[in-house]
UniProtKB/Swiss-Prot annotation:
Organism per entry: Prochlorococcus marinus (strain MIT 9215)
Family, similarity comment: Belongs to the pseudouridine synthase TruB family. Type 1 subfamily.
PANTHER family recorded: PSEUDOURIDYLATE SYNTHASE TRUB1, TRNA-PSEUDOURIDINE SYNTHASE
CDD domains attached to this UniProt entry: PseudoU_synth_EcTruB (cd02573)
Reactions catalysed according to its record: uridine(55) in tRNA = pseudouridine(55) in tRNA
Function statement: Responsible for synthesis of pseudouridine from uracil-55 in the psi GC loop of transfer RNAs.
A biological-process GO annotation: mRNA pseudouridine synthesis
Gene3D superfamilies for the chain: Pseudouridine synthase
Protein name: tRNA pseudouridine synthase B
Active-site residues annotated for this sequence: 41
SUPFAM superfamilies xref list: Pseudouridine synthase
């Protein structure tokens, strides 16, 4: 089956790993160069963007925030920090109002430090934490800084001790850790009951598709692929209109920048990436302004010579 470079936004089912999805897409599209943009736990459903072909090189330039809707069960602590783990403690939960509960949630908004679950893909001395955990090894994980951009209380089921939240966060945030820690500050216990990712890396569930639908499409499956350049709409664009400039770019040489661009472009900070295109709006790669803002230095070059 023929394929195009770009992104497939998979609506992942429960029980399927992110790597399982990648393997299925490789087989369906008959291409080896496939990678996902961030692991979803097997029990988590929802949006899983998958890069195809040269799009795998652009993953780091996608928006990094992700949005979830999750349910937290108070009163239960497990060894995995979700409902599927072994119960290690149970405790009653407080009978508080939504307003009071939201006050507690405020502690998780902004930049916070969290200790990842021990059953996680975090590396510990060169090995995944979950492997050590499954061997019942004793180890500690260091707190990591994450950013919670939005955290909304959607529902508080006080009778059953279930909190429904919507959360927009940085890459690397563990919602299981938030469930565990929220239970702790409420003088109870907490674990993640259910989680759905509704957006990731600039893609949302409206643009997602089930792998079963891709299978049904067969040779027409590439029609679901979103072009790489469309996934980079959040990045300012610089156009190369001369063959000489394009040749310079494709041979890895810096391009002298048009001064008028600096007045129109939002990204004056040389640390911000620019997507470089030709006169037909075909993507040529990613570059960065130099310290003097006089040239664009190539960082990622498609069709390099």
């Amino acid at each position: 089956m023929e394929t195009n470079d770009g992104f497939l936004v998979i609506n992942k089912d429960k029980g399927c790993t992110s790597h399982d999805c990648v393997k299925q897409i490789r087989k369906l599209l008959n291409t080896k160069k496939v990678g996902h943009t961030g692991t979803l736990d097997p029990e988590v459903i929802g949006t899983l963007p998958i890069a195809i072909g040269s799009a795998t090189r652009f993953i780091q330039y996608l928006p990094q925030s992700k949005t979830y809707i999750g349910k937290i069960k108070l009163g239960i602590r497990t060894n995995t920090d979700d409902i599927h783990g072994e119960i290690i403690n149970q405790k009653s939960w407080p009978k508080i109002s939504e307003e009071k509960l939201d006050q507690y949630l405020k502690r998780f908004r902004g930049i916070i430090k969290q200790v990842p679950p021990k059953v996680s893909s975090v590396h510990v001395n060169g090995e995944r934490a979950y492997k050590k955990s499954f061997r019942n090894e004793i180890f500690e994980l260091a707190p990591r800084e994450v950013k919670i951009k939005e955290l909304t209380l959607m529902k508080w089921d006080q009778i059953n001790g279930i909190i429904t939240i919507k959360i927009k966060c940085s890459s690397g945030t563990y919602i299981r850790a938030i469930a565990r820690d929220l239970g702790g500050i409420l003088n109870s216990e907490g674990c993640l009951l259910q989680l759905k990712r509704i957006s990731a890396c600039g893609f949302d569930e409206q643009s997602s598709i089930k792998i079963s639908d891709i299978e049904k499409a067969k040779k027409n499956a590439p029609k679901f692929i979103i072009p790489t350049i469309s996934a980079l709409d959040h990045i300012s664009t610089y156009s190369l209109n001369k063959d000489e400039e394009i040749n310079y770019w494709q041979t890895g040489r810096a391009i002298k920048i048009d001064i008028n661009f600096l007045y129109e472009c939002k990204a004056f900070d040389y640390k911000q990436p620019l997507k470089v295109v030709d006169s037909r709006k075909m993507l040529l790669g990613i570059g960065f302004l130099d310290d003097d803002h006089t040239k664009i230095n190539p960082k990622l070059v498609l069709n390099a010579k």
